[in-house]
Design a protein with these regions (language model features):
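Short linear motifs at secondary-structure transitions and domain/linker junctions
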Residues: 34-44, 71-73, 117-120, 139-145
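Intrinsically disordered, low-complexity boundary segments flanking structured domains
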Residues: 47-50, 154
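Flexible acidic/glycine-rich loop/turn elements at helix↔coil and beta-strand↔loop transitions
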Residues: 50-56
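Structural core segment of the AMP-binding/adenylate-forming
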Residues: 1-20, 86-87, 114-160
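Short, charged, surface-exposed hinge/linker loops at domain edges
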Residues: 12-37
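Conserved AMP-binding/adenylate-forming core of the ANL superfamily
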Residues: 36-46, 57-110, 127-132
Length: 160
């Protein structure tokens, strides 16, 4: 092991030891498999959102020349959630997202899970036929997509 690897391992061990912010603990999942997780992190998105809400005007997201505070992110996500409810989306319904990584993806995700719906992320590298196939099989009631991903889906009508 070279010196830089030793240094990385030493720093990692210091950050992940008991009592540190990135403390790692082992747990056994429902299949009996042992896994590792951060001990001090929230165990639900709701708790994470509650924690994040305490940071109001601090930067939540910086994307190219755009800046969003935590307050901005929650305000936009709430609008997304309200629009979903107005569109008839209910708790447990599936809503897909197919777009490049950008702020809108994050706000759509937060809005979806914020109302208790299930987010079905689709691969943004897919072409129209692949997106269509996924939508026909995931039971999404609605899809968020950017212009590039929506191209070729104009005539898409999925009914079950």
């Amino acid at each position: 092991m070279n010196d830089s690897n030793k240094l990385f391992e030493q720093i990692s061990n210091e950050f992940t030891q008991k009592g540190q912010l990135f403390e790692i603990r082992e747990y056994t999942d429902s299949f009996g498999l042992k896994n590792k997780e951060f001990a001090t992190f929230s165990d639900s998105l709701r708790k994470y959102f509650d924690f994040a809400a305490m940071h109001g005007d601090k930067d939540f997201l910086v994307f190219e020349d755009e800046r969003y505070s935590f307050a901005d992110a929650f305000k936009i996500s709430a609008k997304v959630g309200n629009a979903l409810v107005d569109a008839g989306i209910q708790k447990g319904d599936r809503v897909s997202i197919c777009m490049q990584n950008n702020p809108e993806f994050i706000f759509a995700y937060m809005g979806i899970v914020g109302i208790g719906a299930v987010c079905v992320p689709l691969n943004s590298w897919w072409v129209a036929d692949e997106i269509t196939y996924a939508l026909e099989h995931c039971d999404a009631k609605l899809m968020f997509g950017d212009q590039r991903r929506l191209k070729g889906l104009d005539d898409l009508k999925i009914t079950k």
